[in-house]
Amino acid sequence: MDLKLLNDQGQAATFSAPDTIFGRDFNEALVHQIVVAYQANARSGNRAQKDRAEVKHSTKKPWRQKGTGRARAGMTSSPLWRGGGRAFPNSPEENFSQKVNKKMYRAGIRSILSQLAREDRIAVVDTFSLESPKTKLAAEKLKALGLDSVLIITDTVDENVYLATRNLPHVAVVEPRYADPLSLIHYKKVLITKPAIAQLEEMLG
């Protein structure tokens, strides 16, 4: 698979990328599965409701068991009563995680990268570095490359690059092992350094 190789001025040449990573068929069902699993595994428990033991209530029986003609009632915390506890309350300990085995996950990442390559959403650079941790420098460099919304995948995240890009709203910098399926799909472009491609090939090939 041929990808665009950009220099610092944004001028393009051709880079021959491995077909094992960038030349696979698109498997929509698999990609959907790993994206949903990734989102589910990122969820944190923040829902809480009270059951009948946790709501504030009196243990006094509202009325006697027999003789009133009304339905029997034991206490006001019953889920049947207004203000009572929930029968099956949501809990912050609820587990939303979904398991995807490594073989499927790697195949899904290869499928995403291949589709991005076909859509011309991947570009390659030799390296990506900055002289100082200035956001202005990072913005100017990305503008010269013709990139605004971009996921930068580099073999090692340079401290200057990290500090300079962290305040840019549509830019993220990650190492190959942290390139998740949601980020790959989310950004308009993916910029990969040559050493990072070698790492991806080793991880996914």
UniProtKB/Swiss-Prot annotation:
The gene is rplD. One of its GO terms (cellular component) is ribosome. This is Large ribosomal subunit protein uL4. The lineage of its organism: Bacteria, Pseudomonadati, Pseudomonadota, Betaproteobacteria, Burkholderiales. Keywords: Ribonucleoprotein, Ribosomal protein, RNA-binding, rRNA-binding. Residues 58-69 have a biased composition (Basic residues). One of the primary rRNA binding proteins, this protein initially binds near the 5'-end of the 23S rRNA. It is important during the early stages of 50S assembly. It makes multiple contacts with different domains of the 23S rRNA in the assembled 50S subunit and ribosome. Forms part of the polypeptide exit tunnel. Residues 48-57 have a biased composition (Basic and acidic residues). Residues 43-95 are annotated as: Disordered. Coiled coil: none annotated. One of its GO terms (molecular function) is rRNA binding. InterPro entries: Ribosomal_uL4 (IPR002136), Ribosomal_uL4-like (IPR013005), Ribosomal_uL4_dom_sf (IPR023574).
